[in-house]
A protein has these predicted regions:
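Multi-pass membrane proteins that catalyze or facilitate reactions on polyprenyl-/lipid-phosphate substrates
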Residues: 1-87, 91-208
């Protein structure tokens, strides 16, 4: 784990654009797979999806203002990350990335035996454990009672959070402009997105 975290930290520090485009491909592929699982999409479903995307994008935008990483925040990150173990198509790494704690958690893993790092990682694990216990029943009930709507909202959340993983150098407000500005800097970024896209497709086929 420590060796792997060192590699990821190196990539994040030196190849952030390539990593961002790779995650972008992962997300787009996950969205397509999840949409394919929904049968008979109606206009109301599309409206719910768009509304969910808008809500989460605004929440994440507010979260990025004066964000301070504390033990409580790391606990919340662990709590939210527990979704990745319950919900299909969501990566824990992706959730940490959009919450702005991915780099922080990896650094703490590399210095795990420091008292400070140990407390942060413990807070994260405890938050995840509480999240699993809490979310498992709620998510199970939602999928049993409102499977289609739950999937639609989940996809909307994924789409709405895309802007958080793409560097927004020109401070654009529109996700399409953010994406265009990012990929227009280097066409090689499309290649990394394609790899991410194909990875999810391959994993999905293997799982079947």
């Amino acid at each position: 784990i420590l060796l792997f975290s060192n590699i990821i930290l190196f990539l994040l520090d030196n190849y952030i654009n390539e990593i961002s485009s790779f995650f972008f491909g992962l997300i787009i592929s996950s969205v397509f797979i999840l949409l394919n699982k929904i049968k008979g999409i109606k206009i109301s479903d599309i409206l719910i999806l768009v509304l969910s995307a808008l809500i989460i994008s605004q929440v994440l935008k507010l979260n990025s203002i004066n964000q301070e990483i504390t033990f409580a925040y790391i606990f919340i990150c662990g709590f939210i990350c527990s979704c990745a173990m319950i919900l299909p198509g969501i990566s824990g790494s992706y959730i940490l990335l959009i919450l702005g704690a991915y780099h922080f958690i990896l650094k703490k893993l590399n210095t795990l035996f420091d008292s400070d790092s140990y407390l942060y990682i413990s807070s994260f694990i405890f938050g995840g454990a509480v999240g699993i216990i809490t979310f498992s029943r709620i998510i199970k009930w939602l999928f049993k009672s409102y499977e289609k709507r739950t999937m639609v909202v989940m996809i909307g959340f994924i789409i709405g959070s895309v802007s958080k993983i793409i560097p927004n150098k020109n401070n654009q407000e529109n996700i399409f402009l953010i994406t265009y500005d990012f990929f227009s800097t280097s066409y090689s970024l499309f290649f990394f997105s394609l790899i991410g896209f194909l990875v999810i497709i391959l994993l999905n086929k293997i799982s079947k």
